[in-house]
């Protein structure tokens, strides 16, 4: 076999070839457009790029929920309420009593199973409907199972009552135009005091405090989010709204624009769903489709991110089609835990990932974009004056 003579020149050519290959491989491995870059994590990379000219979108895939992510550098933090003047009780799972504004008030505290003292969790405030109470929300909302599986703390207030002036209608929570500012402030202070005591005694994620209400509880939630947007990260309004008939209007949330879910149970004829989400008590006829759309108008004008959900079952418990293994309202809790306080106005991880699988098909990002639920399978009808 013929073999080329071994020379210094050939050694030099071989060395240059090896150097060229090494250079090409090196350049290719650092190509930022290469899909396999995810296989080479950079553990020392900063957790926030808020100072960069074009910051990356929030990532809800690296963590189960965005509220699990580390607090970004220079993140905007919520205001923190002062401790109640009468002090805090020793909080425990179950019923708790507190003195707020000189009155004795109560609430349920739900902790997840195996809650460790060092575990930092989001807090969800849950406001019940007219015919229900705090325990009804706990049971029908499957809140304990949800807290165990999704890892959050829940505070379920007990209502003091709120009667519409000139009627005997007790809406449980103050939201109507006959409620004086002093009554509204009393309920806002109750929220402040519950939150302050939770912050004092529990390791809570202060950037992930949300308010969620159903029917009358949603109507109050929609007032609370305006009054305490400097403390609340997000909201979920399930058959709520503003401005219709006797409901107080939308006046805005100020500098912080909390993202929210706006859900209702139908627009009625002549719309395609054929059912109307209406509370026809004492001839007042509050229409939650009108009230919800009125709130959407205010939210859009002010620059909030919203998810709109429309079902076709009227004023009943939402017919949420939850994936197997998850609690009934898992998608609503998930929304709250994916929208921390530090998100910029109008920002959401859902704009990058789309809605999660737990969210009903009749929900969509943005006002007017949802396709109403169709078909049967609605929950049993309830007395609209009781739900």
Predicted regions and their residues:
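N-terminal secretory signal peptides that target proteins for export/translocation
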Residues: 1-14
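Sec-dependent signal peptide recognition
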Residues: 13-21
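C-terminal motif of bacterial Sec signal peptides marking the signal peptidase cleavage site
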Residues: 24-26
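Bacterial signal peptide processing site
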Residues: 28-31
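A domain-start/cap signature at the N-terminus of enzymes
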Residues: 33-34, 41-43, 49, 53-123, ...
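Serine-hydrolase catalytic machinery in alpha/beta-hydrolase-like enzymes
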Residues: 89, 100-108, 119-207
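Structural recognition of the beta-strand scaffold that forms the well-ordered cores
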Residues: 107-108, 123-127, 152-158, 208-213, ...
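The feature captures the conserved acid-bearing segment of alpha/beta-hydrolase catalytic domains
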Residues: 230-322, 327-330
